[in-house]
Amino acid sequence: MVSNNILNTVSQGVFYLDPLTHGVIGLAISTFSGTPVGMTNPITLGCSIGAMAPDIDVVTKFIWDDSVYLKHHRGFSHTMPALLGLSGVITGILHLLFPESAIMGIFLWTMIGALSHTLFDILNSYGARLIPFVKKKFKMNLLMLYDPVVTLLALVLIFKSQKDIVVYGTSVAIFIVYLFARYMMRKRARKAIEENFAHGYKIISIDVLPALMAFHKWNFVLSTNSHNIAGQVNILNKRIETRKKLRREDKDLVKVFKGSNAGQYFTNLSPNYHVTMKSDEGRIILEGIDLRYFMRDNFMHHATVVIDENLNIVESFLQPYKYEKRIPVAEHF
C-alpha cells in the first residue's frame, strides 16, 4: 500500500511523505532536549514544525504551476537566512501560545529542526541550497527520499519512554554508521557500473544516486563520448539494468536547445540531461530529458523546443512529471 501511494504522489509531483518524514525527524530531534514529546511542549512543536517549514515553497505550485515549483523547490527557503527567519516566526507564534516558556530555548530547537530539513535534503538525490546567492544545490546522493532506516530510528526515539545518554549516543552512532554504509553501497554500485561499461565506451562521467524506493538498488547516469546511458544497478548481485541508451545528438542542435528559454530552465533544473532530435513536417523537434528519475517506463521530466529549418524557435514548452503535460514557455523570436 505504501509503495503504491508513493508512486502516485511522486508522479503527480507532490511528495507528501517527504514533509511528513521531516516532521518525524524533527520530533525525534526534539527528544534530545530532554523534554517529553507532547502537543503542549513548545520545544516539540517548534522542532517538528521547523523541520517541515522550509517546504513552504510548495505554495508556488498552487499559485503558479509545476515548472515554477520545480525551479524554486529546495531553493531560497532552505538557505540559512530563510531558516533563521522561519524559525523566528515560528518561535514568536509559539511564545504567544506558551508565554511562560523560554523564548531562546524554543528558538534554538526550532532552528535545529529547520536546519535538519536542509541537511537531510542535501543527503538525498534532490539536494538543496544552503548558501544564499549561490544557486547551486548541494547534494550527497546517500539517502532515499523516503528512507526506512532513518524513519525507524526516529520513531524509536519518539516512542521510547526511558531515554538516557546511552540511548542518544547509540542513536547518533547508528545514524553515522548507516551513512557510511550507504556511502560504501554507492561506491560498490559505481564500481559495478565501471566494470560493466569499461569495454566499448569511453566513460566521461558517472553519477550514482539512490533509487526512489528500492533500498538495495541505485540509479545511475553514465556519460560517454558517444552515448548517455541511464539505468539501475542491484548492489547485491551487481546486475545492471540499462533503461535507456541514447546517442548524443549534433552539438549545434544541442546548443540551440540550451539557448532557448525552455532549455535554459531545463538544464538549470537537471545536471543530467539528454537532448534528442526528430523531424516532423519541415520542423525539428528537440526534446530534453532529465535522466535522473525514471518511473512507469518513462522519465519524469521533459522539455521540448520546436525549431524550423533555419534553426529559429517556433515554440517551446516544459513537461514536468508527466510527458503529456505541456507548460508553454515564452521565447524571444
Language-model features, listed with the residues they occupy:
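N-terminal membrane-targeting hydrophobic helices
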Residues: 2-202, 206-210, 217-224
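C-terminal regulatory/interaction regions
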Residues: 196-333
